[in-house]
From Swiss-Prot:
GO biological process: cytoplasmic translation
SMART domains in UniProt: Ribosomal_L2 (SM01383), Ribosomal_L2_C (SM01382)
Region span, Disordered: 28-53, 223-274
Species annotation: Pseudoalteromonas atlantica (strain T6c / ATCC BAA-1087)
Family label: Belongs to the universal ribosomal protein uL2 family.
Gene: rplB
Quaternary state and interactors: Part of the 50S ribosomal subunit. Forms a bridge to the 30S subunit in the 70S ribosome.
Role description: One of the primary rRNA binding proteins. Required for association of the 30S and 50S subunits to form the 70S ribosome, for tRNA binding and peptide bond formation. It has been suggested to have peptidyltransferase activity; this is somewhat controversial. Makes several contacts with the 16S rRNA in the 70S ribosome.
Entry protein name: Large ribosomal subunit protein uL2
HAMAP family for the chain: Ribosomal_uL2_B
One GO cellular component term noted in the UniProt record for this chain: large ribosomal subunit
Protein origin, superkingdom: Bacteria
Amino acid sequence: MPLLKAKPTSAGRRHVVQVVNPDLHKGAPYAPLLEKNSKSGGRNNNGRITVRHVGGGHKQHYRVIDFKRNKDGIPAKIERLEYDPNRSANICLVLYADGERRYILAPKGAKAGDQIQSGSDAAIKAGNSLPMRNIPVGTTVHAIEMKPGKGAQIARSAGQYAQILARAEGYVTLRLRSGEVRRVLADCRATIGEIGNAEHMLRSLGKAGANRWRGIRPTVRGVAMNPVDHPHGGGEGRTSGGRHPVSPWGVPTKGKKTRSNKRTDKLIVRRRNK
């Protein structure tokens, strides 16, 4: 997909770089697969801010995505590709032979009219979903389950994929884009190929207001605050008081390990690249 650099007709347009995909549907989304998507403004049920830098943004409907791909043996045709404001990847509206329509993540190279299928006997072809025990070693996959039947949780954003390295003892070994190597049950499903719209990472919003459209509020540095607001606040000039970087609540940050140990840690063969 080509990248479009905006003409510098104003300061806000000067640095804008957009991803242009002429194959995306230009009309309204498929209404039966839309749900209300209320905004919280980062507040909990007491009205207190629990997540900073959240608020505003354009109204959006949530597109119900089929992450389970459990209509086995029923062929489907991709009707159209669509933009989804809730994720970096594009989505496909697929029509099954029994008349049902569903949204799925758009794999790389997908186009209207392509045939896809789910199930153990599906062909090894981009967009087809099947248990990883039936996928050859070395295949690139995306939309990977971590528990059989739960739905895809790994490799769901634009340009993402994982590679199957080995299969043994009821598990498959995957190498993720982060460099992490981990084992997943072989009965978990995955979709062949990689997610499309990899150029998403090359776009440039161009101005602060574009982030506000996405519901992202400004991030103020602690050293720019007063002492009452942040441990780094106050002082004459820029100084953090000689302490290590901390959050507004005094929790060490920038290097402090925050990941809790989990029972499934034993399935991680190699940690991700730093």
